[in-house]
Amino acid sequence: MKKTILFIFLIIPVFVFAQEPTKNQIKNAEKITNYVADKHSLSKKDKKIFYDATLNQIVTNAAEIKRQGITDSEAKKVVYRKGYNNIKETLSKKFGNQKAVALLKSGNEARRK
């Protein structure tokens, strides 16, 4: 009983304080996803998986930078690299390593446009 109550009190703040994506983050994730989906002919299901992973990475990176109060571009690169590795791992589980890398390269192309 104590473990259950403790678990509930520890898990609630995770959901209450979880950061919601901003309109710009959603727009950015949609732009990247649409570009990648068109280039690689992703199914709707695969497109949704890629969108969720991309949006999660964008939101997580922004939250981590804000949490740490990072302003230095070199320090931000460390956060972005960690986020890249996380999304690569997620996509590799679904699509395989080679396709995941190709999708992420296309995602980087979309960011530059």
Predicted segments, located by residue:
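Bacterial Sec-dependent N-terminal signal peptides
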Residues: M1-N24
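Charge-rich (acidic/polar
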Residues: Q19-K113
